[in-house]
Amino acid sequence: RDVLGSRGLGDVYKRQYHGGENLEEQLSEKELADLKAKELDILVKFDRMCKENNLRYFITAGTLLGAVRHKGFIPWDDDIDVVMLRKDFNRLNRVCSKALPEGLFLQDKKNDKGYPFHFDKIRLDNTEVVDPFLEGVNMHKGIYIDVFPVDKCPENNKLAQFMFKWVSTTSYALIAKQNKDFDFDYTKKSARMLYHFMIKMPRGFVIAMRDFVVGIFNVFCSGKKLCTVSGAHGFPRETYKSEWFEEKIMLPFESGEYPAPKGYDSLLTNMYGDYMKPPEDDEKSGHFTSVESDK
């Protein structure tokens, strides 16, 4: 049995708020089209900044799947996901402080004291997306793209599962510190104890403990196996072979081309299985219930 379990952040999120019975709460076609246009504009500016500052990134998850299967957004998808290898991700804050275009905001643990997650977001100022999962959390809630770090991952599955669950549990605790109605009933006693312990600790302590564990694995793991430990799909679907990221390939996405891992076929197969087969209608859902602009 695994130590703490292995679900990703997105598993709880989708189960609580985005089952088929809640599809009527999602965005209208016009709202979705407007949201995608703004997200794409963020991606274009992010891509330009990365090129000008020698930052490597790759499209991933639903964005990568959309590029391969649709040459753009998955029709019902409402977000953009990119990843950076850890060495590039660690430069992102410094680069953004000097080069991020006006009107955009790098949301990370340093720039937004209410932000609970282990990954970053590039937010659009003067907008807001209503995300039920983050109700009560005091932070910038503008339209965004996700930027996930890719870390070294233990080759031992039990340790890898621990790494995933450590990050998700500490992140949930940071949400619960702000939203007293938020709770997750872990089935494993060890995870439940960690969750309730972390809720009582100061924010800085929780983040330091989260970063410490991830940092230890980055120091001592071989690097043959990588992972997006804060991704939506959890272990083992967000684990990769390092050679998948050794080279990039440009793939069409909407009106442009964006870098993807050369091993994208293996990545998508691991994440989605038969990824060229569209899901059933009751599995088609997005993240948001409404979008506001020009706040």
Residue ranges and their predicted role:
Residues 1-16:
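Single conserved hydrophobic/aromatic residue that forms the stacking wall/gate
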Residues 4, 84, 260:
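Small/polar loops that bind or transfer phosphate-bearing groups
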Residues 22-51, 96-155, 173-188, 192-273, ...:
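Conserved catalytic core of two-metal-ion nucleotidyltransferases
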Residues 47-80, 84, 89-90, 243, ...:
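Active-site nucleotide-donor binding segment shared across nucleotidyl transfer reactions
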Residues 156-162:
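A short secondary-structure junction signal
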Residues 166-167:
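Short, His- and charge-rich active-site/binding loops that engage polyanionic ligands
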Residues 170:
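Helical lid/core segments from catalytic subdomains that handle acyl or acyl-like groups
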